[in-house]
């Protein structure tokens, strides 16, 4: 029964959280399910991540300080944090890309938060002018957001000491949405940033609620939810 629930969570509830932009909840649901469906793999990845964190703390601090210095010298005030991948996201990439755990976890990840969209692109230009960019790793989700309205700039560079560095650049508001998804809109309900037009993007969610309230069998809800979730897109992470 536990395995059945874990599979259901992985197939329905985690993707549903993703579709609503609730990345933090999605990650928690995936991790809980992963701990049931493949506990040995999860433990292996967690041990690898712990090893990397313990042995690269000084490197993280040095690189973060250098990036901050570069931005501040050009009038951009930002906060930079390390970005840790979740065990399941690492496992999924290992399976999809057929690469080793060591190859994937050797990459250092940072999240750069700035005050406005203009600074996002300025920061990107500074990073690319200072460090070699890795071809094929640039994605602009600000000009072209994901279907769940996620916005951010992703790029990868060869940083100091020849480290491969993945960088996400976004505003504070974009970061809040990336974590809380549709719920972050409620914060702006009484402000100019919020409008009824925002909710038209989530008409599919209203349909889903109606299906649940009709009291159909769990099997009907399960199948309908899958159809509603994936009828337009195939999600890549």
Language-model-derived ranges and their functions:
Residues 1-237:
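Nucleic-acid processing machinery
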């Amino acid at each position: 029964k536990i395995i059945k629930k874990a599979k259901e969570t992985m197939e329905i509830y985690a993707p549903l959280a993703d579709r609503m932009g609730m990345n933090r909840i999605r990650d928690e649901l995936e991790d809980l399910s992963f701990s049931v469906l493949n506990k040995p793999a999860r433990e292996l990845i967690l041990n690898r991540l712990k090893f990397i964190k313990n042995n690269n703390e000084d490197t993280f601090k040095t690189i973060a300080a250098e990036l901050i210095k570069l931005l501040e010298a050009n009038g951009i005030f930002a906060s930079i944090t390390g970005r840790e991948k979740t065990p399941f996201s690492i496992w999924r990439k290992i399976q999809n890309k057929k690469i080793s755990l060591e190859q994937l976890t050797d990459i250092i990840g940072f999240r750069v938060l700035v005050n406005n969209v203009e600074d996002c692109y300025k920061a990107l230009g500074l990073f690319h002018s200072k460090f070699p960019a890795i071809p094929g790793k640039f994605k602009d989700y600000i000009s072209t957001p994901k279907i769940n309205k996620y916005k951010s700039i992703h790029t990868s560079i060869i940083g100091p000491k020849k480290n491969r560095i993945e960088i996400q650049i976004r505003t504070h508001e974009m970061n809040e949405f990336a974590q809380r998804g549709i719920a972050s809109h409620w914060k702006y309900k009484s402000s100019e940033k919020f409008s009824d037009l925002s909710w038209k993007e989530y008409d599919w969610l209203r349909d889903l609620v109606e299906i649940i309230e009709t009291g159909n069998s769990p099997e009907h809800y399960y199948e309908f939810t899958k159809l509603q979730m994936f009828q337009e897109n195939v999600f890549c992470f």
